[in-house]
Regions:
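N-terminal secretory signal peptides
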Residues: 1-17
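Residue-level detector of intrinsically disordered terminal segments
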Residues: 15, 36-37
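Beta-propeller domains
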Residues: 21-33, 49-543
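Signal peptide processing junction and immediate N-terminal pro/mature segment
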Residues: 37-50
Length: 543
């Protein structure tokens, strides 16, 4: 494997041709959300032709086939639940790294409808259990209502992403949740999340489903629950929200706060300017921030049998800020140009200034999301970069928000931070991205993980080399009280030249360019992943 350290390159240094960018966008999750799942098909995506015609009313643009959510050379359906003891390790697991690395992603039980998108598919959770230098691997499907109904029927019953009008009549009124997007540790449960439904509660150690529709002891008022709750850096409280909270297509958002013991201590309702995919949000010690973008609810497309969203080009964005703990009446919406922002790296308040670091593209980041105006998807405009959004709340007449690209030469999605700093000012961020300065520009850039230092604006790069696709990277602190950024980075690498076989790579977070401290070598391909979570040993001992 190759590695290097880099200063932030100029915008020109990061320029890619259309073919390379398409491969990088899919292969390094430079779109957003489930692009890590798409990443496993990166080798094929790099050779895909651009869409030749206008987008259809549903599904991917013409010429864009749906990529298998697993390894590049693997089968389109994976469905392997595994238990592997003492996985082979190259190198040495650090003695202070003990806990569990969890992952979740869509792994369809049955072939997807050809007009459906890769966001769909039943949630499959995996765990790398790390103890005393040894690693065990386990994976299990989330056994929720949807999974059990389809298993009994032995066929797909929910054929279109977030469109209940297409469901089989036998599942009318049944929860449609896939529980396939993210996971979080709460009250000794592993909550598997999908933003259109309540969570599913799993056992932290066995991954068996305990409650397929977990509603926090009846306290959850919203019909939905975000895939990206935040943990307060001081109290450990969980701040979360649901959009379309009063039902399908509604403009209601419910935001709330729950203690580590499970008590809801704050609850507020707000309205949004229009119904869009609010996949993530930002929380600081003082403020809540929502971002409304033109990936919008498309009622006509749904009536025509299509998916929930389409990109409504030309529609403005809105940066909404409200104070934590209030009733939401102080909510202010700041207007901006057409943009997409799907994930938050970190956020903080400095007096009345609010700062939110996000992945941001000029427009639709997803090649499989329909363009409402029928135009072709543009991979260049769909490229995401880490961008700082800000607003000065002391200026009562302020109508818009500011945008600053922090690292112009880097394109990527699925940003992360040290999660202990979810609501506090932070220094380090992490991102999967294509190599910003490949030696051979005629080839598809290698996949990298990058550590950004916001104080110096420098970047350190781990380069995975040829034939590898990297999933999202997650930070694990050395200890509960370790300084920010002192610990390890870990994530799954799919080996595209080995039929998609997977490795877990562990790096020194302070020196990722030095290469792996340890490589955990699975004999199989790991289950698909959108997001992952590190849970330290001291939290598992209470489970």
């Amino acid at each position: 494997m190759n590695s290097k350290t880099s200063q932030t390159p100029s915008a020109g240094d990061g320029t890619m041709d259309r073919r390379n960018f398409m491969g990088a966008a899919l292969g390094a999750a430079a779109g957003a959300g489930a692009a890590a799942m798409m990443a496993s098909g990166a080798a094929a995506a790099a050779d895909s032709p651009p869409p030749p015609a206008a987008a259809p009313p549903m599904g991917p643009p013409p010429g864009e086939s749906l990529r298998a959510p697993g390894g590049a050379s693997g089968p389109k359906l994976y469905r392997v639940e595994a238990d592997i003891r003492d996985v082979e390790i190259d190198g040495k697991i650090p003695s202070d790294l003990n806990g569990a690395f969890y992952r979740v992603g869509p792994d369809p039980q049955y072939p997807l409808n050809p007009h459906n998108i890769p966001f769909d598919g039943e949630g499959h959770v995996s765990m790398f259990r790390i103890q005393n230098g040894h690693v065990d691997y386990k994976s299990r499907y989330v056994r929720n209502d949807r999974y059990k109904a389809q298993a009994k029927a032995e066929r797909i019953l929910f054929p279109m992403y977030r469109n209940p009008s297409q469901d089989d009549p036998s599942v009318n009124g049944l929860s449609r949740s896939t529980a396939n997007t993210h996971i979080i540790n709460h009250r000794n449960y592993l909550l598997s999340l999908k933003e259109d439904s309540p969570p599913a509660a799993l056992d932290l150690l066995t991954l068996e489903t305990i409650d397929p529709n977990y509603r926090f002891d009846g306290q959850l008022q919203s019909k939905t629950f975000t895939a990206h709750p935040k943990i307060d850096s001081e109290t450990g409280d969980m701040i979360a929200f649901g959009y379309e909270a009063k039902g399908f297509g509604t403009d209601d958002v419910n935001v709330f706060q729950i203690t580590p013991q499970g008590k809801m201590v704050w609850n507020a309702w707000i309205k949004v300017p229009y119904v869009s995919m609010i996949h993530d949000f930002a929380v600081t010690q003082k403020h809540i921030v929502f971002y409304v973008m033109p990936l919008a609810f498309d009622e006509q497309q749904i009536k025509n049998g299509g998916i929930h969203w389409s990109w409504n080009s030309g529609q403005p964005t809105y940066f909404g800020v409200m104070r934590r703990g209030g009733d939401g009446k102080d909510l202010r919406w700041f207007k901006g140009p057409e943009r997409s922002s799907t994930h938050v790296m970190g956020a903080f308040s400095d007096g009345e200034h609010v700062y939110v670091d996000v992945e941001m593209s000029q427009y639709n980041p997803f090649p499989f999301m329909p363009m409402r105006d029928g135009s072709r998807w543009d991979p260049v405009k769909g490229a995401s970069q880490i961008t700082r959004l800000s607003a000065d709340l002391s200026k009562k007449s302020l109508k818009d928000y500011k945008m600053e690209v922090l690292y112009p030469g880097f394109f990527g999605a699925l940003p992360r931070q040290d999660d202990r700093y979810n609501t506090a000012q932070y220094r380090y961020g992490y991102l999967p991205c294509p190599d910003p300065d490949p030696k051979d520009r005629s080839k598809r850039p290698a996949a990298c993980w990058v550590r950004f230092d916001h104080q110096t604006r420098k970047a350190q790069i781990f380069n995975s080399g040829d034939g590898t696709t990297l999933n999202e990277v997650v930070f694990a602190p050395k200890s509960k009280t370790a300084p920010e950024g002192v610990g390890y980075l870990m994530g799954v690498a799919n080996r595209n030249f080995e039929n998609g076989r997977s490795d877990l790579i562990i790096l020194d977070a302070e020196h990722p360019e030095a290469g792996p401290l340890a490589t955990v070598k699975l004999p199989i391909r790991a289950v698909p992943q959108i997001h992952g979570l590190w849970v330290p040993e001291y939290q598992l001992k209470t489970a």
